[in-house]
């Protein structure tokens, strides 16, 4: 008789075998049902709510529910005599092929000739010519349908658009403006040029003599209000370019009117005898004609502005919004008399808050064109007072190109509108000079220059050329630069400030004569901090001029320098070297006592053209420098100073230089001095059991100096290995050697071994040499192993780092590349050493992570440094694992801390896991299981089997198992055998220990099945059946079974039930049409769909959800929180990265649970029902969007956290009279 456990497993198996997945896919529809604009003013910004419309949301929300179903838009005011007739049969004659479209697409012929050719054909047959133009615009939208002469004569615009909408190709989301491929690359430019040329060629005749411009505008207006994105995008572009061309025509008419008025006044003011009445009459007739033309053009512009712009500037598609803003900026610049008013400026101001980068960028660029003209700034005062705060805040925009343009806009405001930017506004820009993005930092540097430096150090121009700056002006510049750097307390590195100012003030920063004169001046009034800053500015400027690239952390994005830049760089390098070679010894002599100042001065040598020491006959200055270098090395023991000194001497000790012998002699003299001191001090240490503090300090300082030079120079001939080993052996045996001495001694022995290996690798070494080196290396490893148990933490960590590096160097990798003769040097650590390394890792790396503060306090800096040191230790251990030095099973000690220490070491552990899987997929999977087993066993030993799955530690283990499952990625078929193997071995472990005979307790390891359930979403349907059978077979060996199923078994069986594999039962989470609208017009990517399925597969255990239904999804809501947690923590959802970022916020509102539509897969009208649903999305979702999007869409616009109050909260602004003008919308 089967037990209850076996019955539970059997029930699950039957449910699994009987399950079947069903899915429905929607036909693609490229229509945007919520494209936001209606001619009657009842529209609402569906996807781009901005703060200026908050006061209108409530009213629109009420109207939205009562709005009738959307129909194809019609012209608001049909022109008298327009073509409005009844519908007729769809059988119509086909017009000839549209050669106009093909010619514009090819973009090979002259556009003016093309337009003239079309105008000739239009004059011969106006109806056919205009029909060809209409079909050109239709074909430019990507529509395969055409307008026939019968349609043209008998149907209205709205009926034509409705007919074309029904014929629109829905198989692809591409249309000419966005289509990929070289043939469409230049189409948009040719299209815009055609519209411009058309108006330009018609402006003197056809534009006023019967050309049906009103019909064309009416057609474009109707198309711009279409639900089809291609119609809306293309027609909006055409309408806005048409408007721009008409604005230029209106401007010319305005000029002609002014000229006519002047001519009329001049003629009328003539005397009676000189006045010509015919001339006055002709001028009056010309004025009347110009006024009529002006009224016609203004009527056209008004129709385009009110019919297209006021609806499309807030369209759901960002490309359309960007077109509108770009063009209105052109109108304001070219025809400022009519368009540069607050009633038009408000649209740019409101759109500054747009969610998309491209739209904000167009806004800022449009404003740059306005503020760049000083004559126009007087009309911008009201706008500036209203939107200045927003423009200043855009300096911190999350998109760098927008932030760069925002800073440049503020520069124009600073130049052309005095007193507008307050000190607080400017102080919000100053920190940006230290930004990591060089373009942004350079723009902020230019702002800083014009605000602080230019007024005091104005460059006087004469004859268009700059005069040489006076010493007083340069001194003022450097004093202001020092004041800003020191008093602002924004940053500690002058290199970033110099780089930011380089493009605008490079000539001043390259005044090395002025810098050195300030530093060497005896009666200077510079403080210690100012001297250090000035030296850092000098070195940063020299490095920038000689190397030509920004400091670490800033990337220009440029691949290389131009020939002109390389020549300038070479000239600057020579100029710098010739000036500083005589002065560098003087600077070192003056500041040799200060380590902070002497270190950057020693680094100056890397900026020199050292050949000038020879060609310029400056050897005497070389001798002075070498003397000062020796004094600095003997005087200091700080690592930074010693490293800089050793590197400077290394640059001079190049055998290619003619002065090599002098530099080599100075090096030998210095090392001899240090070695003699070391031998004397070491002898005293070995003979005496006690040393005072001065003796310890002197010995440690000498060892540090030797260690710094041994790192850069080959000091093998001084034979420092043996005395250092004696010192370390005494430290290990007696423990009487101070730790200050042990640390540099360990480093010295390490460098000695590496330099010996370098010599042996370059030539065929004898067996004796190889054996000697191996003995030294093994002896040093034993010393380091002994130091791992030292009481001093610094010694332990130093020994671990050196030991890790040596084991890696002498690993089997050293014989790769034809160096098989080094095989005797290959070393494998013993098991005891491997165990000690792992134990060290547990004691020093995986300790309780501390919360880092703001980073400003000294304690926070120390904590960050300690974290970096721990990361270095972990990285060394992981490299030993991946290169086969340590047993791969030791990786379980690392992987089991993956989740707990994710914030500190997550990137390192993830990379180790990825590399380990590449080496051996099967073994890596077993290591993951081993990590879980070890954690489970530790928890079991600590707390016992009772209530184990309710402990917080067990919940953390489940999170770790979930993260392990996610690390398998989307290759479900490739990892199939691994996941099945992991489940089987996990089941074996859970039942490996059984309770005593007669006991009713569950096996102690049974709760491990709950951890295995996290891997169940990675299984295929067939594998779940096999695993259920395997579990049932294993349970038969359980002697005593309770009267009810054990909880872990029930949970595990439930994870193998059919409701878990949502990726198989519901291939799409979002309907096709919805996903298309969210993601944009691009074609659906099969990889994106696959990644979406995989994400659904592994993140939840939700029952299969039929498309467009609302089921029990909401009851499982907590599991969706897991996805957000994984994304915030940076989980391994690598396969989900291919999905578009845009629309992620809105996708929460577009899920199937929000549609209460009955789902009947077998119903005959499903396709039509879904089509109607996709066409009426706006009506169904408007309530949700009104309530939720207005607060969500603006959250990520800027990097800084800022919120914008609604109109009702902040009161009416200065533009309220226009903002609340509903008729304009």
Curated annotation (Swiss-Prot):
Tissue: Testis specific.
Post-translational modification: Phosphorylated.
Cell compartments where the protein resides: Nucleus; Chromosome; Chromosome, Centromere
Coiled-coil regions listed: none
PROSITE patterns per UniProt: SCD (PS51425)
Basic and acidic residues bias (residue ranges): 1078-1089
Primary localization class, coarse: nucleus
Modified residues (Phosphoserine): 1203
UniProt signal peptide: none
Keywords of the record: Cell cycle, Centromere, Chromosome, Chromosome partition, Disease variant, Meiosis, Nucleus, Phosphoprotein, Premature ovarian failure
Domain of life of the organism encoding this protein: Eukaryota
UniProt feature, compositional bias: Low complexity: 15-26, 1090-1099
Stretch list, region Disordered: 1-97, 546-567, 1063-1113, 1177-1225
Biased composition annotated in UniProt, kind: Basic residues: 59-69, 76-90
Family: Belongs to the SCC3 family.
Disease connection: Premature ovarian failure 8: An ovarian disorder defined as the cessation of ovarian function under the age of 40 years. It is characterized by oligomenorrhea or amenorrhea, in the presence of elevated levels of serum gonadotropins and low estradiol.
Name of the molecule in the record: Cohesin subunit SA-3
Organism whose genome encodes this protein: Homo sapiens
């Amino acid at each position: 008789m089967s037990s209850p456990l076996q019955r539970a497993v059997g029930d699950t198996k039957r449910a699994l075998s009987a399950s079947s997945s069903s899915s429905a896919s929607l036909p693609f529809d490229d229509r945007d049902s919520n494209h936001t604009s209606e001619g009657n003013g009842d529209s609402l910004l569906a996807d781009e709510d901005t703060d200026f419309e908050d006061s209108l949301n409530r009213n629109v929300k009420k109207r939205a529910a009562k709005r009738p179903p959307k129909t194809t838009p019609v012209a608001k005011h049909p022109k008298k005599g327009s073509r409005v007739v009844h519908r007729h049969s769809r059988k119509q004659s086909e017009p000839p092929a549209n050669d106009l479209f093909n010619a514009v697409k090819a973009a090979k012929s002259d556009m003016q000739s093309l337009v003239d050719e079309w105008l000739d054909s239009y004059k011969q047959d106006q109806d056919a010519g205009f029909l060809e133009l209409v079909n050109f615009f239709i074909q430019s939208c990507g529509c395969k349908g055409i307008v026939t002469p019968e349609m043209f004569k008998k149907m209205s615009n709205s009926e034509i658009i409705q007919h074309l909408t029904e014929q629109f190709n829905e198989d692809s989301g591409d249309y000419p403006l966005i289509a990929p491929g070289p043939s469409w690359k230049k189409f948009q430019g040719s299209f815009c040029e055609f519209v411009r040329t058309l108006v330009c060629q018609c402006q003197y005749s056809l534009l006023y003599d019967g050309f049906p411009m009103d019909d064309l505008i009416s057609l474009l207006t109707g198309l711009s209000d279409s639900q089809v994105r291609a119609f809306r995008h293309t027609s909006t572009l055409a309408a806005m370019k048409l408007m721009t061309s008409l604005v230029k025509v209106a401007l010319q008419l305005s000029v002609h009117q002014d000229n006519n008025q002047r001519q009329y006044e001049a003629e009328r003011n003539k005397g009676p005898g000189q006045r010509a009445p015919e001339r006055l009459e002709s001028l009056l007739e010309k004025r009347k004609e110009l006024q009529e033309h002006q009224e016609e053009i203004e009527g056209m512009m008004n129709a385009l502005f009110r019919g297209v712009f006021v609806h499309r500037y807030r369209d759901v598609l960002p490309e359309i919004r960007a077109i509108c803003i770009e063009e209105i900026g052109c109108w304001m610049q070219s025809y400022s008399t009519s368009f540069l008013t607050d009633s038009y400026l408000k649209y740019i101001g409101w759109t500054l808050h747009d969610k998309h980068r491209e739209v904000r960028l167009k806004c800022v660029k449009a404003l740059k064109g306005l503020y760049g003209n000083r004559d126009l700034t007087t009309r911008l005062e009201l706008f500036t007072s209203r939107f200045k705060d927003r423009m200043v805040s855009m300096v911190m925009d999350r998109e760098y190109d927008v932030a760069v343009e925002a800073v440049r806009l503020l520069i124009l405001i600073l130049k052309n509108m005095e007193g507008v930017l307050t000190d607080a506004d400017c102080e919000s820009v100053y920190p940006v000079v230290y930004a990591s993005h060089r373009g942004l930092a350079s723009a902020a540097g230019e702002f800083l220059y014009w605000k602080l430096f230019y007024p005091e150090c104005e460059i006087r121009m004469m004859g268009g050329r700059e005069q040489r700056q006076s010493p007083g002006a340069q001194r003022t510049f450097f004093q202001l630069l020092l004041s800003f750097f020191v008093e602002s307390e924004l940053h500690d590195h002058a290199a970033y400030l110099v780089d930011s100012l380089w493009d605008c003030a490079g000539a001043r920063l390259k005044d090395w004569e002025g810098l050195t004169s300030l530093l060497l001046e005896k009666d200077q009034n510079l403080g210690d901090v100012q001297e250090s800053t000035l030296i850092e500015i000098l070195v940063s400027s020299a490095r920038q001029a000689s190397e030509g690239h920004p400091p670490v952390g800033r990337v220009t994005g440029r691949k290389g320098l131009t020939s002109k830049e390389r020549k300038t760089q070479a000239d600057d390098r020579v100029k710098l070297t010739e000036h500083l070679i005589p002065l560098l010894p003087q600077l070192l002599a003056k500041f040799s006592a200060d380590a902070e100042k002497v270190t950057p001065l020693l680094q100056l040598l890397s900026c020199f053209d050292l050949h000038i020491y020879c060609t310029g006959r400056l050897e005497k200055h070389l001798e002075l420098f070498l003397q000062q270098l020796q004094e600095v090395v003997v005087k200091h023991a700080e690592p930074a100073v010693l490293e800089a000194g050793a590197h400077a001497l290394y640059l001079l000790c190049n055998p290619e230089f003619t002065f090599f012998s002098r530099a080599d002699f100075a090096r030998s003299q210095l090392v001899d001095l240090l070695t003699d001191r070391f031998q004397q001090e070491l002898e005293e240490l070995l003979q005496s059991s006690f040393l005072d503090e001065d003796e310890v300090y002197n010995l440690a300082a000498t060892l540090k100096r030797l260690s710094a030079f041994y790192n850069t120079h080959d000091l093998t001939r001084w034979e420092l290995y043996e005395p250092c080993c004696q010192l370390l052996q005494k430290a290990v045996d007696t423990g009487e050697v101070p730790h200050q001495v042990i640390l540099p001694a360990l480093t010295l022995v390490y460098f000695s071994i590496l330099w010996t290996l370098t010599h042996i690798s370059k030539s065929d070494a004898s067996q004796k040499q190889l054996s000697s080196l191996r003995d030294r290396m093994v002896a040093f490893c034993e010393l380091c192993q002994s130091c791992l148990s030292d009481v001093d933490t610094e010694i332990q960590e130093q020994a671990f780092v050196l030991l890790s590096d040596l084991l890696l160097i002498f690993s089997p990798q050293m014989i790769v590349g034809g160096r098989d003769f080094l095989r005797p040097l290959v070393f494998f650590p013993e098991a005891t050493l491997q165990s000690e390394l792992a134990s060290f890792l547990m004691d020093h790396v995986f300790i309780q992570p501390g919360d880092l503060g703001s980073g400003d306090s000294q304690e926070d800096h120390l904590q960050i440094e300690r974290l970096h040191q721990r990361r270095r230790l972990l990285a060394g251990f992981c490299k030993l694992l991946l290169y086969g030095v340590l047993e791969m099973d030791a990786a379980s000690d690392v992987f089991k801390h993956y989740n707990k220490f994710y914030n500190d070491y997550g990137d390192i552990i993830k990379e180790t896991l990825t590399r380990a899987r590449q080496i051996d997929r099967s073994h890596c999977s077993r290591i993951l299981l081993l990590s879980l087993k070890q954690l489970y066993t530790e928890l079991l030993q600590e707390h016992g089997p009772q209530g184990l799955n309710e402990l917080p530690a067990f919940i953390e283990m489940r999170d770790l198992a979930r993260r392990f499952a996610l690390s398998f990625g989307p290759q479900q078929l490739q990892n199939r055998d691994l996941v099945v193997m992991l489940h089987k071995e996990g089941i074996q472990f859970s039942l490996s220990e059984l309770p005593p005979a007669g006991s009713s307790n569950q096996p102690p390891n049974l709760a491990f099945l709950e951890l295995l359930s996290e891997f169940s979403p990675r299984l295929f349907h067939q594998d779940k059946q096999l695993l259920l059978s395997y579990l049932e077979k294993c349970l038969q060996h359980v002697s005593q079974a309770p009267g009810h199923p054990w909880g872990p078994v029930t949970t595990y069986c439930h994870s193998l039930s059919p409701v878990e594999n949502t990726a198989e039962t519901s291939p799409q989470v979002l309907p096709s049409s919805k996903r298309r609208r969210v993601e944009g017009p691009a074609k659906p990517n099969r990889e994106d769909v696959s990644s979406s399925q995989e994400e659904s597969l592994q993140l939840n255990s939700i029952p299969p959800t039929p498309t467009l239904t609302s089921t029990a999804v909401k009851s499982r809501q907590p599991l969706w929180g897991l996805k957000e947690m994984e994304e915030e923590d940076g989980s391994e959802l690598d396969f989900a990265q291919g999905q578009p970022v845009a629309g992620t916020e809105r996708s929460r509102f577009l899920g199937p649970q929000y549609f209460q539509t009955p789902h009947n897969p077998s119903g005959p009208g499903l396709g039509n029902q879904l089509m109607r649903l996709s066409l009426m999305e706006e009506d169904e979702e408007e309530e949700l969007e009104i309530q939720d999007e207005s607060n969500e869409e603006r959250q990520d616009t800027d990097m800084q956290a800022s919120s914008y109050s609604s109109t009702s909260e902040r009161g009416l602004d200065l533009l309220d009279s226009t903002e609340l003008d509903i008729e304009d919308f």
